[in-house]
Regions:
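Bacterial Sec-dependent N-terminal signal peptides
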Residues: 1-45, 542
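C-terminal outer-membrane/trafficking sorting elements
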Residues: 2-16, 546-560, 564-634
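Acidic, Gly/Ser/Thr-rich repeat motifs that build Ca2+-stabilized beta-propeller blades
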Residues: 44-241, 319-324, 329-337, 423-466, ...
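Residue-level detector of beta-propeller blades
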Residues: 57, 104, 198, 473, ...
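Solvent-exposed strand-loop boundary residues in beta-sheet-rich modules
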Residues: 92, 269, 459, 535, ...
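Beta-propeller domain segments
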Residues: 113-123, 127-129, 137-139, 228-231, ...
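Repeated scaffold domains used in trafficking and secretory/extracellular systems
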Residues: 485-487
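Short, compositionally biased serine/threonine- and acidic-rich segments at solvent-exposed termini, linkers
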Residues: 535-546
């Protein structure tokens, strides 16, 4: 049989014979479930993060970091959920400075004043000090150095000890003014220092809980509405209504008059609206509620009031971000599922996202009391005695952009089982990447409390995940899979290849398996800021073509699949002068393999390579280097 390619490895020459390739079915869902399930068996999980990125710890000993945001003054802003602090570090900070405490710009005291609980509380609200967003004109207008914060500020009923009673907290959103040390009016004592001061309350008395507060903030990157101003968006969860110690709490995610289980849309500055003359919190907040919001209150006496509700039917959306794909801005969100079906959604106004009537994709009907399985009968403690698909169609539900583990009905785990093995990734936040890491442009980065970081490559329209961008819908190489990641911030420099993550201080959850104290489950590198720097930027295209059939060639040669497990296929243009010399090198250019082919289509066996990133160099028959491709070996 004729050899396709002659290889020289370490000076030994041998022939590779052609054979029929098996189609690769590396399903993301199966991969993830198996990886999660075998943790207890101490299986070795190959993490390719260090193959692609340099990782440095630049700060540590943070008090349950919850938010990390890249600020317009090139600082990283971090909120501490249990420290009730806002701190800053320079984006240029290195590992040599990791023992230097971050700069504290705001601290709200616990156990006194408006925060009527402290660290000794047996049941902590989910979150605490939560989301942070910085006004787009922070640096261009000295009068708009505004920062917005959300935090839980009042415990009304949440018994300590072993009681299984419902926990009632209250949450607020505030507007702050930031002062540099040299700014006129800086309120700090001499010598002045950078400081953040609360100047107004946007919303107060919002529902709060020890579960599903959500609490993420973002600001539209463009001015909108009849007042032509930036708008503030806030995720607020369903309070854990219908589960664990809140199982008797009413779930209001489908009630558009309330704030639970919603995404809210607010003004970034008061609009001056006069009172509507009715006694209601929406009247109290009227100057912060945009006049073009989609809903008026449905009760007749309050119908003059706009509500802050932008979308509804959310369970626990802890991530929200704007992204621009090919000139179109979209609002994206990540949301925790129940026992399965975590979601990534495109957020639209006046739109129903299904919870607690539907979990994840409505078409799979994996929650129902009408089938033969017992573990999938309820959502939020309510009987699902209907078809999810029928309900979604009848009620105009928006289908998720992406859902993890749209598990079959027979596979839904039982209530009371170990929640750490449930088929979920626990998506804690989301960000949008439009930089120049090869193959990553226009991707959503979804952080996970169970399994690190995932990338979803969007199609050119921005409204679907590009399932043709890699062998699986998300990257098949693991990223930060040993860490419990709370949030991610991305450098605005498209060529820096730099982003930062904050790691949760413990592995505790809101459920009974994790415990309520938040102190009994260890996690890797807890309470740190990790800086990830892409190892090299080369003029390469990272082609991610999963088709086993021949792809369309845009350059002289194309390789697929990428990432690869064992076999790389190469497809070249026929006008290439033969013979072709192919070399495989590491990222430092050191030659590992080389071979010669007289054909346009051939394959390379790379199973002997260690997991990581490699270069494939192509030379034509004249000895001219005509193309370099980068590929990932799993």
């Amino acid at each position: 049989m004729k050899s396709l390619l002659t290889w020289k490895i370490r000076g030994v020459t041998f022939d590779l014979l052609p054979y029929h390739m098996k189609k690769l079915f590396h399903s993301f869902f199966i991969l993830l479930f198996l990886s999660l399930s075998v943790i207890s068996l101490k299986a070795q999980v190959v993490d390719s993060t260090t193959s692609l990125f340099n990782i440095d710890t630049i700060a540590k000993n943070l008090g349950y970091p919850w938010e990390i945001t890249y600020g317009p003054e090139d600082s990283l802003w971090i909120t501490e959920a249990r420290g009730y602090r806002v701190v800053r570090v320079s984006s240029n900070r290195t590992a040599a400075q990791k023992n230097t405490p971050p700069q504290q710009v705001l601290k709200i005291p616990l156990g006194a004043g408006e925060i009527n609980f402290d660290r000794s509380s047996n049941r902590w609200p989910q979150g605490g000090m939560q989301g942070l967003a910085i006004h787009p004109e922070f640096m261009s207008d000295i009068n708009k150095r505004w920062v917005y914060l959300s935090y839980v500020y009042k415990k009304q009923a949440c018994p300590n000890g072993g009681s299984n009673a419902t926990c009632i907290f209250r949450t607020k959103i505030v507007q702050c003014r930031f002062y540099f040390a040299t700014d006129a009016g800086n309120p700090t004592s001499l010598p002045h220092r950078d400081t953040l001061t609360i100047i107004d309350t946007v919303l107060s008395n919002l529902p709060g809980s020890n579960d599903h507060n959500s609490g993420r903030l973002t600001i539209s990157p463009f001015k909108e509405g009849p007042d032509d101003e930036y708008k503030l968006y806030y995720t607020i969860g369903d309070m854990g209504a219908g589960q664990f110690n809140n199982d008797t709490r009413v779930n209001y995610a489908q009630n558009i008059d309330t704030c639970e289980g919603k995404i809210l849309r607010l003004n970034t500055e008061p609009d001056g609206d006069a009172s509507f003359g009715v006694v209601h919190e929406y009247n109290t907040w009227r100057q912060w509620i945009p006049n073009d919001n989609p809903y008026n209150h449905s009760v007749a006496v309050f119908n003059v009031l706009k509500t802050p509700v932008y979308s509804f039917g959310h369970r626990n959306a802890q991530g929200i971000v704007w992204g621009n794909v090919n000139g179109t801005w979209r609002l994206y969100s990540s949301e925790h599922g129940d026992k399965s079906d975590d979601e990534v959604n495109t957020i639209l106004p006046a739109t129903n996202y299904g919870w607690p009537k539907v979990a994840g994709l409505e078409s799979d009907n994996n929650y129902s009391s009408l089938d033969a399985f017992a573990n999938n009968d309820r959502l939020a403690n309510s009987l699902i005695n209907y078809s999810e698909n029928t309900w979604a169609t009848t009620n105009g539900m928006q289908r998720p952009l992406f859902a993890t583990f749209n598990w079959a009905a027979s596979a839904i785990p039982a209530d009371g089982s170990n929640i750490f093995t449930w088929p979920t990734i626990a998506p804690s936040s989301i960000d949008f990447y439009d930089g120049n890491i090869p193959g990553w442009k226009n991707s959503l980065l979804v952080t996970s409390l169970k399994y690190g970081l995932y990338r979803l490559k969007l199609k050119s329209t921005g409204d679907y995940v590009d399932s043709a961008s890699s062998l699986n819908i998300v990257d098949t190489f693991p990223l930060l899979h040993s860490w419990r990641i709370r949030d991610v911030a991305i450098s605005p420099n498209p060529n820096s290849g730099t982003f930062w993550v904050v790691t949760d201080s413990t592995g505790s959850t809101s459920g009974p398996t994790g415990g309520f104290s938040g102190s009994n489950i260890p996690t890797k590198d807890g309470g740190k800021i990790l800086k990830l720097s892409y190892k090299t930027f080369l003029p390469l295209a990272l082609h991610e073509n999963p088709r086993v059939g021949r792809p369309i060639v845009k350059d002289l040669i194309q390789i697929f699949p990428n990432p690869v497990v064992s076999i790389i296929n190469l497809h070249g243009k026929k006008e290439l002068k033969k013979p072709l010399l192919v070399q495989i090198c590491d990222l430092y250019g050191r030659l590992l393999k080389e071979g010669i082919s007289y054909q346009n289509d051939f394959f390379i066996e790379v199973s002997s390579l260690k997991p990581g990133a490699y270069l494939l160099k192509l030379y034509n028959g004249y000895g001219v280097e005509v193309q370099i491709e980068k590929f990932i070996k799993l």
